[in-house]
From Swiss-Prot:
Its EC number is 6.3.2.2. Signal peptide: none annotated. This is Glutamate--cysteine ligase. InterPro entries: Gln_synth/guanido_kin_cat_dom, Glu_cys_ligase, Glut_cys_ligase. PANTHER family: GLUTAMATE--CYSTEINE LIGASE. Keywords: ATP-binding, Glutathione biosynthesis, Ligase, Nucleotide-binding.
Length: 535
């Protein structure tokens, strides 16, 4: 590889973190994974059964819950220092789930199985408490606004943080007027700006949804090609149709594109969106003709989490606290990377080698210079991302950098060269060579697009002469066999079962003891809570 010059700031920060007394800080980064997956029948139909009680209460179980649908599971690992332990934790949650799923399977890819009519796609249910009802009505609102089909897409969310001591160390050598908390938030927002610039690379390397079931787009205009079988649509050079404009799209959110110049402007833009009426939603109202709730409010966003983005600044919330309240009160604690497809060739949907690379990539985004995004840069970042998810493997594809065209492979190779010193530093801190190895694996994909997961999905479908559903079912069955033949130890199984039992008891206690407030009043108070925040 050609030797690319690193920025002065990146060099200085790497030298500081690489000092003997500071290197251990890189061992204290935290990694957490959330993996969504649909429950399906043995014949690849959406499971119509309720969330299995043996998995615990979705409202209160911290590791096994539901996302949009009663049939859409979400597995959540704790945030751990060693990513190998994070992946192992995710593996164990899968094994526990399979011990309780009977004949059902976990769907292997991000794009959903053939879905029933919308009325037969069950919304996740969280019981009779006011917070449980709020979560249910919020999901009814999502169905009203975007349709249920879109909400059945699954993904991997990757949570990453640097230790606070690392931010404090970096602050000492830099001219920053605010306090330690402000510097940390400022730095995470800078990370997010760089992520916006470079996240197209993750889509090329890890996108794994080049094809989908034709029913997903029923009644919608599209430019996909029919191939493999009558029920499969695809794009020949696509990396991630999940992250394309075929996935989540919203006219209401079209003008809501924070460019992450600082935490205040980010929280203000979201606060405005959850308080600003949007006429098409106003026309529908919050209740149907029978007086039943259909959405929490008629604003651009019902709640801040409705804003769909590839990465989010996050802060752990207290009970009853809203995400924006936590960010305003205590600043940014970590970032949540939300654009990763599930790899259908991997039982857990993500590998340790991928995790190692994401760590180095996100750390590069954190340590590299990050000027505020001008409007043309915001536009370029969005168009680059969209180009890669729809045709990232097209030979000779060009992206826009500084308003000039640049070959994808050239830019990708430059980025890997700049990420390499960070990978080396992570390896040095941990006494391994896995991060450098992960860089080599990614460079091979840049040199040969057939090695990318998206290309391998299409190659496997072609080799087996099968469409999207047959491929996905085959992978789902293979992963089910893996998990069912690798059960948890008796103690691990007992621990998960105890957690499930406790979660059911916690939900029952909440429903029995919560303050008697009618739901309309509860929703009103919840909405008012966001209007009272001051930065």
């Amino acid at each position: 590889m050609k030797d690319y010059t690193l920025s002065e700031l990146l060099n200085r920060r790497l030298a500081l973190l690489g000092e003997r007394n500071n290197l251990s800080l890189l061992e204290q980064c935290l990694h957490g994974i959330e993996r969504e997956c649909l429950r399906v029948t043995a014949t690849a139909e959406l499971a119509q059964t309720p969330h299995p009680q043996a998995l615990g209460a979705a409202l209160t179980n911290g590791q096994v819950t539901t996302d949009y649908s009663e049939s859409l599971l979400e597995f959540i690992t704790p945030a751990l220092k060693n990513p190998a332990e994070t992946i192992d934790s995710l593996d164990k949650i899968h094994r526990f789930a399979y011990s309780k799923l009977g004949d059902e399977l976990l769907w292997s890819p991000s794009m959903p199985c053939p879905l029933p009519d919308e009325e037969h796609t069950p919304i996740a249910y969280y019981g009779t408490s006011n917070i449980g009802k709020l979560k249910y009505v919020y999901r009814k609102g999502l169905a009203l606004r975007y349709g249920k089909t879109m909400q059945c897409i699954a993904g991997i969310h990757y949570n990453f943080s640097l230790p606070e001591d690392a931010w404090a160390l970096l602050k000492q050598t830099e001219d920053f007027a605010g306090d330690a908390r402000d510097y940390q938030s400022h730095s995470y927002i800078a990370l997010i700006r760089n992520f916006r610039r470079y996240s197209w690379l993750l889509m090329y390397l890890f996108g794994a949804s080049p094809a989908l079931d034709a029913g997903f787009l029923r009644g919608r205009k599209h430019q996909l090609e029919q191939h493999f079988d009558a029920d499969t649509l695809y794009l020949p050079y696509a990396t991630s149709l999940r992250m394309s404009d075929l996935g989540y799209q919203s006219d209401a959110q079209a003008d809501l594109t924070p460019c992450y110049n600082d935490l205040v402007s980010y929280t203000d833009s979201l606060r405005k969106a959850v308080a600003t009426p949007y006429k098409p939603y106003v026309d529908v109202g919050t209740h149907d003709q029978n007086g039943e709730w259909v959405q929490l409010n008629t604003n651009v966003l019902q709640i801040e989490n409705e804003y769909y983005s590839n990465i989010r600044p996050k802060r752990a919330t207290y009970s009853g606290e809203r995400p924006i309240q936590a960010l305003v009160a205590r600043g940014v604690q970590y970032v949540e990377v939300r654009c990763l497809d599930i790899n259908p060739f991997l039982p857990t949907g993500i590998s340790l080698e991928q995790s190692r690379f994401i760590d180095a990539f996100v750390l590069y985004c954190a340590l590299e210079e990050s000027q505020q995004l001008a409007s043309h840069e915001c536009s370029n970042a969005s168009s680059n991302f969209l180009a890669v998810v729809k045709e990232g493997r097209r030979p000779g594809l060009s992206l826009q950098r500084n308003n000039s065209p640049v070959d994808l492979k050239t830019w990708a190779t430059e980025l890997l060269e700049k990420i390499t010193p960070i990978a080396r530093l992570l390896d040095q801190a941990q006494g391994i060579d896995e991060h450098i190895k992960s860089i080599a694996v990614q460079q091979a994909k840049i040199d040969d697009a057939s090695l990318t997961p998206s290309a391998q999905v299409l190659a496997s479908m072609k080799a087996h002469n099968e469409g999207f559903t047959a491929f996905s079912l085959r992978q789902s069955q293979a992963h089910a066999e893996y998990f069912r033949t690798h059960p948890l130890s008796a103690q691990e199984q007992a621990d998960f079962e105890a957690q499930a039992k406790t979660s059911i008891e916690e939900q029952a206690e909440l429903e029995a003891t919560e303050e008697v407030v009618d739901f309309d009043t509860f929703v009103g108070s919840y909405q008012a809570s966001i209007l009272s925040i001051s930065n």
